[in-house]
Structures are given as C-alpha cells and as structure tokens.
Amino acid sequence: MTRPIVSSRPLKALYDIPAPAKLNLFLHITGRRPDGYHLLQSVFMLIDWCDTLHFELRTDGQISRTDLNSPAQNNFEALPAEDLAVRAARALQAASGTPLGVHISLEKNIPSQAGMGGGSSDAASCLLALQRLWGVRLPSQDLRAIALSLGADVPFFLSGSHAWVEGIGEQITPITLPAARFVVLKPAAGVSTPDIFNAPDLKRDTKTATMLGFAAYADGPVFGFGHNDLQPVAQKLCPQISQSLDWLESQQLQGRMTGSGSAVFAQIFDDADLAAAPGNWIIRKCKNLQTHPLACW
C-alpha cells in the first residue's frame, strides 16, 4: 500500500452524509472459482433510498458507533464485529496511520437482509467521509482494495454511478441509465445469503451477457433485461419472496428480486396509488439516481 496523503486539517464533524441503496436490475451467476467465490454479471443501480451517517471527531483514537434508530442509542459499548461502518473506519485508520478516531451515528433507513446493499453503502460512505474528517487521502487503488476487503458490493458504492459489474464484484464499469421510478417491497422475513450460494440447485452456468446486449434494451424495457439466478433458490428458502412477487403481479407490475433478497421491485410509470402492503412489510416508491451523492468526494 502506498503512503497516504495528508490532504488537509481534520474537521470537527460531518453531518447528514447519505448512503444510497442499490437495486440489481439482473444478476447472473456465470461460474465459480476454485476458491469457492461465484462469478457474476449484474447491473447495479443507485436509488434514492438512503441511510444517513453523522461523524464526530474523536482525538483519543477510539472508534464508536450508535444506531439512532435503536432504543439503546446511548450505549456505545459492545460494537458488533460484523458492523461494516466500524470495520471500514478501522481499516482506513490503520491504512492511513492517523491517530484520530470517530464517533459514528447511523440513521438506518435501508432494511437489512434485503439485497439492497445497505451495509455496504454505509461502509463506502464511511470511507469517503472519514478521509475528509481526518484530513487524509489514500490513493484510489488503495481505497478500492480496502473496500473489496470489506465486501464484494462495497467497491461499487465508491464508483459514483450505476455500473455494469462482473467478476466477484470487483470489475466495475460505469454506465448511464434512463431516469425511472420503482416500487420496492421488503417482506418481514429475510434470507441467508450463504444459504443461497451454497444451495446445490443454484444455477451457476448462465451464458455470459454483454454490455452491448444490455444497451440494446436502451430504447425498450431496459429494466427487464436478464433475470436473477438467486431468485428461485431464495423463493424456496423464503416463501414471503414469492408472496411479494404475487403482490406486485396483483398491482399489474412485473417484479423481480434484488440481490440475494428478500426485497423485490418493479418499475412504475405513474403515481397511481398502490394497495397496502401485507402485514408489516415495507413498501416504498423510489427514483434512480444519476450519480452517487458523494461522487465528487
């Protein structure tokens, strides 16, 4: 790793930093590497459903986090090791050599176990914001390496735009997409991503697609290209995914699952009212973003 650049004086705080969700317009599994990682092709699309992060400088070098949605929001102890925002902060702290720390406050709006990349987006926004807060800047290739070490989806959220994604998620090509609106439905139940990828009946040999083939849909149903190879397995593991897709069909909408679920989505073309979502399921109308809110950071 190359030497980090001290770019400016540290800031006292940064507030209202967005971390947008993504939808996978399609997700094809094209193979599997000898180390077990799956090879994929997908288009990742940014949407205006965001978590919000706040950062306050700590001069004692400690990294702490609280969830503003939690009843125990004043308890800064027992930070979960799997928390991606904390892991991102610690990784950047180690890579940059800064003696500074941070307290992170998170307003969690993107549902977990949804396939919308909420935790990965939090981590990416954390990396970008903390470079400013701490007054350091890593070379872009080093920042991307940290992002990939945190999770396959994190590098996408550093890229700044919608993207054609290949490999294990590290091969990212920016693309443009037409402005559009979507309805996203998240059922109460989640699904385990490892369980999906370990399923013996997961299709792992979808024919490789091309960006040219995807672009050919530009004047047609671009958001209907391809399919999600994870969806049939996820539907078996989580029946509420099938129920969610049935609900979309009842609204005359053609839906599919995003990522490894359990959220599903469909393009909408007007502001017509939709029926209430079943039970305590989350339903939200969204627009796609043309660029990431932190694209110039």
UniProtKB/Swiss-Prot annotation:
GO terms for molecular function: 4-(cytidine 5'-diphospho)-2-C-methyl-D-erythritol kinase activity; ATP binding. The keyword ATP-binding applies. Pathway: Isoprenoid biosynthesis; isopentenyl diphosphate biosynthesis via DXP pathway; isopentenyl diphosphate from 1-deoxy-D-xylulose 5-phosphate: step 3/6. Gene3D superfamilies: 3.30.230.10, GHMP kinase, C-terminal domain. Keywords: ATP-binding, Isoprene biosynthesis, Kinase, Nucleotide-binding, Transferase. It catalyses: 4-CDP-2-C-methyl-D-erythritol + ATP = 4-CDP-2-C-methyl-D-erythritol 2-phosphate + ADP + H(+). Its EC number is 2.7.1.148. The active site is at K22, D153. It comes from the Bacteria. GO terms for biological process: isopentenyl diphosphate biosynthetic process, methylerythritol 4-phosphate pathway; terpenoid biosynthetic process. ATP binds at P111, S112, Q113, A114, G115, M116, G117, G118, G119, S120, S121. The keyword Kinase applies. Catalyzes the phosphorylation of the position 2 hydroxy group of 4-diphosphocytidyl-2C-methyl-D-erythritol. Belongs to the GHMP kinase family. IspE subfamily. PANTHER family: 4-DIPHOSPHOCYTIDYL-2-C-METHYL-D-ERYTHRITOL KINASE, CHLOROPLASTIC (PTHR43527:SF2). This is 4-diphosphocytidyl-2-C-methyl-D-erythritol kinase. It comes from Polaromonas naphthalenivorans (strain CJ2).
